């Protein structure tokens, strides 16, 4: 279904709502961290087929050998912009928000090894669009997001740990 784009509408990103949350809570999203070389490709799992695995909270200090984001290479189109992939990330610095602490944020981006991530391409997907806020945009454990046109399904099956050891499967 269609929705609307809100400029600077990613409440949990540094370029979003920095007035409500403290600076230690807000982090750039994983695609932008990657574009800035703050999150290297070896900490991002890129998939274009079936995959089941774990990602850790990307708003903590990165530990070598862990994955902090999932890039689903689907080359989808949204709002007339093509060549977009889905990005999935988990955040732990919002412990009172179960949509983040127990789930995943999903967005589209054109970030790829040969591209720069631009504002026009980054879209946070609200998994609960019936509410007026994106504070519940996350996909909680047990929920799934399906892209029927690209035949993709993203599902959070479990969550565990806390702080720097917080993860989702």
Over which residues does each language-model region extend?
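Extracellular hydrolytic enzyme modules, especially secreted metalloproteases
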Residues: 1-97
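Extracellular low-complexity, Gly/Ser/Thr-rich intrinsically disordered linkers
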Residues: 54-169
């Amino acid at each position: 279904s269609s929705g609307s784009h809100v400029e600077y509408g990613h409440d949990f990103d540094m370029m979003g709502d920095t007035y409500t949350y403290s600076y230690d809570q807000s982090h750039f999203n994983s695609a932008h961290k990657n574009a800035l070389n703050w999150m290297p490709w070896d900490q991002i799992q890129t998939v274009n087929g079936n995959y089941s695995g774990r990602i850790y909270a990307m708003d903590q200090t990165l530990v070598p050998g862990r994955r902090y984001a999932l890039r689903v290479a689907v080359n989808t189109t949204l709002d007339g912009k093509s060549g977009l992939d889905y990005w999935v990330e988990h955040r732990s610095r919002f412990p009172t928000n179960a949509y983040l602490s127990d789930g995943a944020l999903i967005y589209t981006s054109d970030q790829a090894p040969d591209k720069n991530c631009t504002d026009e391409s980054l879209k946070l997907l609200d998994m609960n669009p019936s509410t007026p806020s994106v504070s519940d945009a996350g996909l909680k454990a047990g929920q799934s997001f399906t892209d029927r046109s690209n035949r993709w399904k993203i599902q959070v099956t479990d969550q565990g740990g806390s702080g720097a050891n917080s993860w989702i499967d």
